[in-house]
Regions:
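A short, flexible beta-alpha/helix-coil linker loop
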Residues: 104, 147-148
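Glycine-rich phosphate/pyrophosphate-binding loop
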Residues: 189-213
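Electrostatic cytochrome c docking/interface patches
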Residues: 152-156
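Auxiliary alpha/beta "docking" domains used to position bulky ligands
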Residues: 2-114, 158
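Iron-sulfur cluster-binding cysteine motifs and their immediate structural context
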Residues: 120-143, 149-150, 160-162, 166-184
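Conserved small/polar residues in nucleotide/adenosyl-binding loops
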Residues: 1-2, 211-217
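A short beta-strand-loop-alpha-helix capping motif that often carries His-Thr
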Residues: 62, 186-190
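SIR2/sirtuin NAD+-dependent deacylase catalytic core
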Residues: 117
Length: 218
């Protein structure tokens, strides 16, 4: 399944802002939220079919989530290596409910849609981490660096302190995607009111109280 997650900061920050946080990290931990949603769905299915067995996963099993989503007709892999959906763009969160029963029918991959000749995500990446083969160079990706405990110092972070939405914020599908409608995905605070100095003076326990992120050490 996919869950749209675009919020008011998904379209980007002011150019001179120096404490940017990826929009997904501004919310409550989506792993727990989506797993709870899948659990509720499984409960309804079990009410109709008591013998049904299954298990929910959200980044918690070695499943090729993006490829499964493509095969299910939910979207395609964009140039920035993320799943892109026709309605919600790439600001979506993935979860799976694996069951021991066959379905009456299965969806097929989408046809006639994709990124075409668009290269906005490639051009938007401040470090050139978006490759031409729908892959990311993790050595140059700001998001990869800032979610590690000891981020490398050899790349400029362009004001990002956790994650990076640069390649997504320029995507035409994302620009016209609607904002999410579920309160569980609302930002827990306004990062624009937090200057870099406030984050630098903050203990880890306090940062976790604002969101589920853990700021990397320097």
């Amino acid at each position: 399944c996919i869950r749209d997650s675009k919020n008011g900061l998904s379209d980007g920050y002011p150019d001179d802002f120096r404490a940017k946080i990826a929009s997904y990290a501004l919310t409550a931990d989506y792993h727990a939220t989506i797993k709870g949603m899948l659990g509720d769905l499984f409960g309804r299915l079990r009410a109709a079919e008591p013998a049904l067995a299954g298990r929910a996963f959200v980044d918690s099993a070695p499943l090729v989530e993006k490829q499964l989503a493509v095969e299910a007709g939910l979207g395609w892999i964009g140039r920035q290596s993320l799943l892109v959906t026709p309605r919600f763009g790439s600001f979506v969160l993935l979860g799976e409910l694996v069951l021991d029963a066959a379905c009456d029918r299965y969806d097929e991959p989408l046809a006639g849609v994709g990124c075409g000749s668009c290269r906005r995500c490639v051009e938007a990446c401040p470090t050139g981490a978006v490759c031409n083969d729908r892959a990311i160079d993790a050595r140059r990706c700001i998001s990869c660096h800032t979610i590690e405990r000891t981020p490398a110092a050899e790349i400029a972070l362009d004001g990002w302190i956790f994650g990076c939405d640069a390649c997504q914020s320029r995507c035409p599908y994302n620009l016209r995607a609607p904002l999410h409608l579920h309160p569980a995905f609302d930002p827990l605070f306004d990062p624009l009111s937090f200057p870099p100095e406030r984050w630098l003076a903050m203990e880890e326990a306090e940062s976790v109280s604002y969101t589920h992120l853990t700021l990397p050490t320097t």
